[in-house]
Amino acid sequence: MRLVFRGSVILLMQMVFLLGLASAQLGNSGSIEGVVKDPSGAAVVNATIEIGNPVTGYSRTTTTSNDGTFRFTNVPFNPYHLTVTSQGFASYSQDVEVRSTVPARAEVSLKVGTAVTSVTVESNGGDLVEKDPTFHTDVDTSLTDRLPLESQSSSVSSLVTLVSPGVVADSNGLFHGLGDHAENSFSVDGQPITDQQSKVFSNQIPLDSIQSLEAVSGGPPAEYGDKTSLVIKVTTRSGLGVTQPTGSFTTSYGSFGSVSAGFRVAFGGKKWGDFFAANGLNTSRFLDPPELQAIHDRGNEENLFDRVDYVISSADSIHVNFQYTRSWFQTPNTIDNLNLGIPDPVTGGPLPPADQRALIKTYNIAPVWTRLLSSNSLFTVGAFVRHDQFNYYPSANPFADGTGFIPGGSSATLNQNRKLTNAGLRADLSYVKGAHNIKIGGTLQHTFLTEDFNFGITDPNFLPSQTDAAGNPCFGGGVALASPCTDLLPFDLTRNGR
């Protein structure tokens, strides 16, 4: 398996190196394109095209090129209201629905404007209502930028909990969909992420990178596997078509000495684009503490995200997502973990408070190539590698982690080094014709997991309390007499174990 994993990494690196950049239609988004003409059939140059969805708040604007064409890429699946305006012509509007990665087309013919101004009031709100029967919630950045999220280190979890009915919040960024325990999965630009995303297991995708989000709370669609409940489909931001660089910078200070800062910037051209986001957090209440007062609960997190798009031709485009996240945090202490009045079992001196910590590093690389086979069909192939490394560190004095002197307390210390890597390939073919929408595809994925544990017994009374298979004491007179005491004696730190 190690050779297969290395081959996958080399293949991905070659794709990134040779293809370099990336683009348009992805697993969770499509595109809208078309041409604007005047009554004679000539192209209308510099006409303003605007699309919007008043429910999600999504809105985009562009202008037609010299041949009258326009194109919106990275458009989330939803119905949109399209409006066209140009000097000397009457305004034009129509509804366009994006339900597939196959581009949705709009052929616009403008009429010559007159001196008469008219206002049309429509009672029909059909463009505000989706025809998709799936139980889901759509969210755009226009809403996420205003929501008071309770956790900067697990903002996506907080967002999903707030906007999705039936989703229940749990501690430390964990949440549960309808009727299932942690059976949630993410699809980020079509990349499946089905592992736990709470902040004690892994690092989430940064909220700044999300353009739109669709939370499917009912039964998951056929194309999403591994989990049985909530599916969160994420479309990331793109710089494609952003000819004038745009960005923002945010910073905040709050309770528990919480300081956060971040910036995001998008820039590009008609055929390429780059979106980059970086943010960081430092706080004295990183995890949810077991006491009313946060004790030994400091933590920090740093996020880097980069999305690169490149349109090779009218039929081919490439897209790559890069992410790196690092989080370090202390394990919150209870009053008992302060070890007040507890002696060191070896030296007899006072024990310091417990000082257990954790470090999580996450990186993700996901290139995607799309090819438009015809005006009705689109082929997509992508690859991905996501790696999580979790390190758990004990206290410098191992006896501070527990000596057994406190009822119900720990009798051991431990450390852990866990590495989880998901690598895979995915491909799908989408076909749209009139009211018919067909999608066929598959995903080949493998999980590589290594776990290393070390522990030491810190309770001097632990071995004397054990018995052998016959129920007789297996430790007496300072000597291990039988199993399990003979097996555990080398790990007893109170008796020169290591």
Ranges and model annotations:
Residues 253-282, 292-331, 357-380:
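Transmembrane beta-barrel wall of Gram-negative outer-membrane proteins
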Residues 90, 126-128, 182, 193, ...:
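Structural signature of outer-membrane beta-barrel domains
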Residues 33, 48, 69, 105-107, ...:
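Membrane-embedded beta-strand positions in outer-membrane beta-barrel channels/transporters
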Residues 89-111, 115-222, 226, 231-240, ...:
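Periplasmic N-terminal accessory/gating domains of Gram-negative outer-membrane beta-barrel systems
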Residues 3-7, 11-134, 208:
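Periplasm-facing N-terminal accessory domains of Gram-negative outer-membrane beta-barrel systems
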Residues 26, 74, 150-152, 169, ...:
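Short sequence motifs at beta-strands and strand-loop junctions characteristic
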Residues 29-31, 79, 103, 155, ...:
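Transmembrane beta-barrel architecture of outer-membrane proteins
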